Amino acid sequence: QSQANHDSSLATATHITDTSPKEKARVHGRDMRAEFINGSNLRNDINIVNCFQDSGSYGVGGAVIQRVTLSDLEGNELDWVVGGEPVRLVIECALKRDVDNPIIGFQLKDRLGQVLFGDNTFLTTLNEQLGFAGGRSISGIFEFFMPRLPSGEFVFNAAIAEGTQMNHIQHHWAHDVLLLKVRQTSFSDGLVGVPMNYIAIELSEN
């Protein structure tokens, strides 16, 4: 089983000289305004509905997605999350035959079908030449900060393929496996709100 490397922004610093809340947020990758936002009516509450059992799909079936979950970093499955907080997306797959160089990935789309963001395991495992026997199970694991989302509904797609980014066999692509419902937002512009590690106005020296 191969686990995607964690984004460097999720890594914990080993030495912090300034322990103020703003500096802690800057080091750990959390929005410096999180405490203020989450304590106000701007908190970006996101309800999560697991729709995997009802999702449409396609693919040749050499590997099949069996479960998709969104959890906290301790593995507790979530039915709601606050935008800007760290989450773990796990895509569990059963191999129906031998699979070489599997690629497991996801997308988050808005109600118009626009892909807001996504990722896969290809680059993480590029130099590993992975191969797994049929009958085994593997999981794609992704840890990231949930972006702040505008009000509305959003869906995750999940997929497992075999090969390379440009030339692959699509074993299983599952549509709309997780539904996100958002009622309140705090970001000011764009399709998604990225947690800001640091925001300031500084006086420049002449």
Region annotations inferred by a language model:
Residues 1-206:
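Localized sequence-composition bias
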